[in-house]
């Protein structure tokens, strides 16, 4: 008997499930420039804003998040650069 001859024991292809936006939904947190703990989760260890393809934030919420991070930096709640 030949291997792989339609025996039904083949592997299924791997599909990565699309992550949902953490800011959409009924009990999702509100993006606020004063919430430093929330904003710091979306800033890298070097101080850069993490892209939405990594954090799975929707495009609209990513724009709001970026604006809140920039506002928090301007007011001194978040640093511009982390050394």
From Swiss-Prot:
Biological process terms from the Gene Ontology for this record are:
translation
Q: Where is the signal peptide?
A: none
The record's section on Pfam families has: Ribosomal_S18
UniProtKB keywords:
Ribonucleoprotein, Ribosomal protein, RNA-binding, rRNA-binding
Molecular function (GO) terms listed?
A: small ribosomal subunit rRNA binding; structural constituent of ribosome
GO CC annotations, alphabetized: cytosolic small ribosomal subunit
Q: Which InterPro entries match?
A: Ribosomal_bS18, Ribosomal_bS18_CS, Ribosomal_bS18_sf
Q: How does it assemble?
A: Part of the 30S ribosomal subunit. Forms a tight heterodimer with protein bS6.
Family affiliation? Belongs to the bacterial ribosomal protein bS18 family.
What role is this protein assigned?
Answer: Binds as a heterodimer with protein bS6 to the central domain of the 16S rRNA, where it helps stabilize the platform of the 30S subunit.
Question: What NCBIfam families does this protein map onto?
Answer: S18 (TIGR00165)
Question: Which HAMAP family does the record cross-reference, listed alphabetically?
Answer: Ribosomal_bS18
This chain belongs to the protein called Small ribosomal subunit protein bS18
- Origin species, per record, is Methylobacterium sp. (strain 4-46)
Please name the taxonomic classification of the source: Bacteria, Pseudomonadati, Pseudomonadota, Alphaproteobacteria, Hyphomicrobiales
């Amino acid at each position: 008997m030949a291997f792989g001859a339609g025996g039904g024991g083949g592997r299924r292809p791997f599909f990565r499930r699309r992550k949902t936006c953490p800011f959409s939904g009924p009990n999702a947190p509100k993006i606020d420039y004063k919430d430093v703990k929330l904003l710091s989760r979306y800033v890298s260890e070097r101080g850069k804003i993490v892209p939405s393809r990594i954090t799975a934030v929707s495009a609209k919420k990513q724009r709001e998040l970026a604006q809140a991070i920039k506002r928090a930096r301007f007011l001194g709640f978040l640093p511009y650069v982390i050394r």
